[in-house]
């Protein structure tokens, strides 16, 4: 799977009408001879305006890639705050926000073992959520630093993810009602998380509110992801399916093709998946 850039228009968050111009990051797993940890490249430059990203993307291939364009909600404009975040072989990114963040941040930190608390270097709620995931994984009996040869497995990652979301909800539920009303606290959490150990990926589309819509998430699978036009520089892609296999799986916050009615647009994950 080649790392390739999308045009500016497809990087826009169309549902909320904002440009994700506050930096970006890519993370990808390389040959096992180089170790289990992923390679990271982050920048505070908008993704569509970074010539180094274009140079790297045209010459980089990986079996598993994370890519994230940032629109600041928490934390300053800094490379420390650009997703994805990594520890050992684990890679994490997030689209959304933790409800009541200012009210739960201290208590979330108090739940963490010192090494996970001290391991947070940026100021985003997303990185703190990753620290909570690492702490949860360790409490389940799995060392997040161990980098197992075949990964932790989807069952373990899924269980740790569900527990992490449950912990976040518990912290928010414990905000006193008087504080919620007095400070007009938005307790809704948008938790579109993605985590991988280089072998398995767990993605969530979740909102804590029963009356609001979760942030969008789309997927497409097939045998080949290629440009629709053979012209050099084309960035209009489509998923090819030569058989029933799924050699390529793409998950994204926005539709991945301009063609309406394709799998990338119609296979929308339901809230809570």
Language-model features: where?
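Conserved short alpha-helical segments that host acidic/polar catalytic motifs at enzyme active sites
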Residues: 1-94, 98-273
């Amino acid at each position: 799977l080649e790392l390739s850039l999308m045009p500016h228009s497809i990087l826009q968050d169309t549902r909320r009408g904002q440009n994700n111009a506050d930096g970006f990051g890519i993370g990808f797993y390389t040959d096992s001879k180089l170790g289990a940890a992923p390679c990271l490249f982050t920048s505070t430059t908008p993704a569509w305006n970074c010539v180094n990203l274009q140079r790297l993307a045209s010459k980089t291939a990986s079996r598993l890639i994370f890519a994230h364009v940032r629109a600041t909600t928490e934390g300053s404009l800094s490379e420390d705050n650009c997703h994805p975040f990594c520890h050992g072989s684990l890679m994490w990114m997030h689209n959304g926000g933790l409800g009541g963040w200012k009210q739960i941040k201290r208590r979330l930190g108090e739940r963490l073992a010192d090494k996970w608390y001290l391991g947070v270097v940026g100021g985003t709620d997303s990185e703190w959520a990753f620290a909570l995931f690492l702490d949860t994984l360790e409490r389940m009996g799995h060392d997040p630093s161990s980098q197992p040869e075949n990964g932790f497995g989807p069952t373990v990652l899924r269980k740790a993810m569900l527990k992490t979301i449950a912990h976040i909800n518990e912290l928010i539920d414990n905000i006193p009602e008087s504080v919620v009303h007095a400070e007009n606290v938005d307790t809704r959490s948008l938790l579109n998380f993605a985590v991988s150990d280089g072998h398995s990926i767990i993605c969530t589309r979740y909102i804590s509110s029963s009356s609001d819509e979760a942030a969008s998430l789309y997927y497409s699978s097939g045998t080949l992801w290629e440009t629709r036009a053979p012209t050099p520089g084309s960035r209009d892609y489509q998923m090819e399916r030569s058989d029933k296999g799924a050699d390529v799986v793409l998950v994204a916050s926005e539709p991945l093709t301009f063609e309406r009615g394709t799998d990338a647009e119609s296979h929308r994950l339901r809230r809570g998946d």
